[in-house]
């Protein structure tokens, strides 16, 4: 029903029932079964009281499923498993909420435009890249990191209102509204001159974390709005290269809009860029301009 809640804490330990929202437990948790495993660690390495000789949660769960005839076959296989380079402990994977670009909505158009590109070898364009587009999924845009381009989205305290900021000038205006609402004392970008694209002007501000996270905006209904903590996938930066290098749309609009310096006549990169640069260039160009980003390409390696 879409209602979800973490069952494992950041230490890799299953929550005990008392630590979980009682309404969620009542409607979604098999308390009799869960109680047998609550409080245990997903991996023994995360429990300082356990050793490699102790029973592991995954084996106990497998045995339980086999006893209840819910597992067809249970057996051990030796295989590689990722470990943290700092702690040497096994990596745990957590499902997280993310921001996506709905690239599946333009899948067919991306396929059509790809057929107009002169690929060398042609088999890469038709095969590897073509198949990638045919099996396209939505683009996971956000990243839970610290260094990088901040996601310019602010969300109200109750989560019902969102603002996506499109320029520094717009952000400065929104901060002024926040000051008037009493949420901020002063504008950290005071002195920044909108429309002045000189290095000296931009040296006055810092749009990265942690500074941008201190900015509180005001929603249309008067609520406080806080920035989403995630960053933008660095591949989006790479895919936006044709426009970003010209500071589009704030400068040199005619170069892009009139296709004076876009799309590129030629690019070249390794075949591994099928899911990287080739894709992000193609995806952004299709969605923003209904165009290819490059006319000819050599894919080596």
In which residue ranges do the predicted regions lie?
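Conserved active-site neighborhood of enzyme catalytic/cofactor-binding cores
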Residues: 57, 115-120, 131-132, 136-138, ...
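Residue patterns forming the tRNA-binding/recognition surfaces of aminoacyl-tRNA synthetases
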Residues: 1-194, 207, 277-278
């Amino acid at each position: 029903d879409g209602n979800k809640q973490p069952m494992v804490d950041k230490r890799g330990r299953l929550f005990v029932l008392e630590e979980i929202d009682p309404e969620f437990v009542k409607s979604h948790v098999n308390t009799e079964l869960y109680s047998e495993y609550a409080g245990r660690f997903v991996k023994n390495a995360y429990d300082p009281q356990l050793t490699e000789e102790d029973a592991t949660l995954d084996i106990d769960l497998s045995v339980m499923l086999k006893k209840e005839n819910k597992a067809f076959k249970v057996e051990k296989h030796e295989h590689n498993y990722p470990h943290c380079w700092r702690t040497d402990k096994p990596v745990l994977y957590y499902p997280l909420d993310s921001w996506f670009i709905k690239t599946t909505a333009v899948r067919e158009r991306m396929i059509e435009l790809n057929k107009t590109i002169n690929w060398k070898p042609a088999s890469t364009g038709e095969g590897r890249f073509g198949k990638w587009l045919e099996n396209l999924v939505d683009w996971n845009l956000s990243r839970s990191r610290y260094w990088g381009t901040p996601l310019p989205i602010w969300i109200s305290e109750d989560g019902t209102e969102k603002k996506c900021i499109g320029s520094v000038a717009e952000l400065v205006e929104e901060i002024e509204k926040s000051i008037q609402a009493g949420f901020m004392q002063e504008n950290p970008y005071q002195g920044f001159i909108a429309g002045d694209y000189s290095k000296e002007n931009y040296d006055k501000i810092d749009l990265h974390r942690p500074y941008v996270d201190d900015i509180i905006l005001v929603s249309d209904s008067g609520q406080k709005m806080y920035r989403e903590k995630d960053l933008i996938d660095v591949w989006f930066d790479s895919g936006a290269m044709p426009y970003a290098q010209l500071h589009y749309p704030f400068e040199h609009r005619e170069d892009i809009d009139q296709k004076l310096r876009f799309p590129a006549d030629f690019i070249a990169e390794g075949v591994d860029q099928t899911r990287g640069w080739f894709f992000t260039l193609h995806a952004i160009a299709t969605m923003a301009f209904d165009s290819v980003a490059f006319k000819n390409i050599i894919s080596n390696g």
